[in-house]
Amino acid sequence: SYAPLLAKKGQTNWNPDLIYFDNTKVYPTCSYYVQQMFGTTAGDYYYGDVAKVEGADKFQGTSCVLNTEKRELYIKVVNAAAEAKKTAINLSRFKNLPAKATMTTISGQPDVENNYEVQPIAPVTKEVNISKKMNITAEPYSCSVIRIKL
């Protein structure tokens, strides 16, 4: 959970909140988008060996879960470093993989944040090619989720 969720402009007691609003506008924060990305990609089976980072990297984390009801595989990659990082993905255990998947990424410099005038940090979704063994590059300061329909 995340509290507080909503904050009205000029009425906040602390930072951060997830969604800010005034009488005419609403803007979600970067944290809101990350919560949304992870909240919509929950799984009930974890695969600890599908996504691997190079070496012992304290700035990068990965997770791979299967939602058995939706028959979707979710690979999550977080890169908290100032430089791009590679992640090796091994999907050999999965049969009948599609050729394409979607990847949603949110990224931005640590000192940039959304506000009432501009929202420079928002998720971008694109189609990606997938294969049994592949590498992806995680952008600096990014969070990505790859959705694969099985």
Question: Which residues does each predicted region cover?
Answer:
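Conserved, mostly hydrophobic/aromatic
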Residues: 35, 75, 141
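Carbohydrate-binding surface patches
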Residues: 58-97, 103, 147
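Surface-exposed coil/turn segments at beta-strand junctions on protein surfaces, enriched
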Residues: 68, 80-82, 129-131, 138-139
